C-alpha cells in the first residue's frame, strides 16, 4: 500500500527496529523532520488505504460499477497519473524547494478526493481518482526526508515512514468497512480530502526547513539521462513496479472472493487486520539481518522468491477464508520487507543533488504499477478467473527476481549516498 511510498518497521514495535538499525542517534531537528514528514505520508496514504478494501464491492452500487474491468481501472488510474507526474514533481522539488511542491500536490489530491466523493457514477469517481493521482508528492517527500537527516540515520528516518504507513494501513483495514456502511464510499472520499488538507497544515507549520548543507548540495546536478538510466536504479524501479502491480491486482480479486464466501464486506477486517499485524511482527528480523550483515540485496532477493511461492499457493488455496487469511499474512511479510528496502536503496544510491529526480522515476514506476495491476487484475479476473490473476502475479515476480541479479550491495550508512561497493 503505496504508496507510496514506505520503509522499515519493528520486531515487536516499530521503535525496536529503529534502535537496532544503527548506533547513530538522531538530533532533535532530525527527529522532528522525520516524524512530521512521516505523518504527511500517513495522512495521505490513509486516504488511499481506506478505499482499497471496500471499493471493489461497493463500486457495484454505482452506475457502470458492474464491470470488473472498469472497477480495476478506477482503482488503478490513480497510479497512472501519479506515474506521469512523479518525475515533474520530483524535478520541481529539486529546483523550487520541497515544501511548495508538496503543498501544491496535497491540494490537488484533496480536490480529486472531493470530486470522487461527488461522483454519481463510476466515470466521475474515475475522474476524481485521476485527479487524486495528479498530486504526485511521494518523490518530493522522500527526498525531503533524505535532505533532512544525515546518511548515518537515513535508515531510521525511512523506518519511521514505514512504521507510520504500516500502522495507517492497519487502521484503515479496521475502520474502512464500518465507515463505508455508515457513510458510503463518498464519505470515505470526503474523509480522504480532509486528511490531505490536514497534511497541508503539517507541512506549513510543523515540518522544519531542510539544513543549508542539503540545499547547497543541489547546485551540482548530473545529466538526467545518467540518473534515469543508472543500471542500479533501473533494477530497483523494475522491482517497485512489480510490487505495486501485484498489490493492486490481488485487492481487485480478494474482496469479491470474500463476499462470495459469504463474509460481509463490513467484516473483511477480520481477515485483513491479523494478516497486516503478522506482516508487521515478522518483517523486522530480515531487515535487521540485512543491515547488520550488509546483505540487503540478498534479503531482497530472498523475499522476491518468497512472494513468488506465495502467489502460486494463492492460486491453489483460495477456497476458504482461513486459507486467504493465512496467505495474506505471508504476503504482507514479504511485501513489507520489500516496501521498506526499495526506497532506502534508491535514496542511498542516488546522487544527493538529483535525489528528487531519482525518486521521481522510482515513484513513477511504482504508480504505473498500481495502474497496470488494477487494470490487468480486473480484466484477467473477469475473463479467466481469480486463479489466473495469481499465476500472472507469480510470473511478474519471477521477472523481477531475474532482473535483481547484478544489483550491487549498497554502501554502509556511514558512507556518502551514491557510493556503492564494487
Indicate where each model-derived feature is located:
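Structural signature of the two symmetry-related core transmembrane helices
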Residues: 100-114, 193, 298-313
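Cytoplasmic helix-loop-helix junction between adjacent transmembrane helices
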Residues: 128-166
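Juxtamembrane intracellular "pre-TM" segments in multi-pass secondary transporters
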Residues: 20-31, 208-239, 422
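Conserved MFS/SLC helix-loop-helix module at the cytosolic interface between two early adjacent transmembrane helices
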Residues: 84-120
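Residue-level signature of mid-helix packing/kink "hotspots" within the transmembrane helices
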Residues: 79-87, 169-170, 276-284, 370-371
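C-terminal transmembrane helical hairpin of 12-TM major facilitator-type secondary transporters
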Residues: 297-342
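Helix-to-loop junctions at the C-terminal end of transmembrane segments
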Residues: 85-96, 282-296, 381
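C-terminal membrane-cytosol helix-exit motif in multi-pass small-molecule transporters
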Residues: 194-213, 403-408
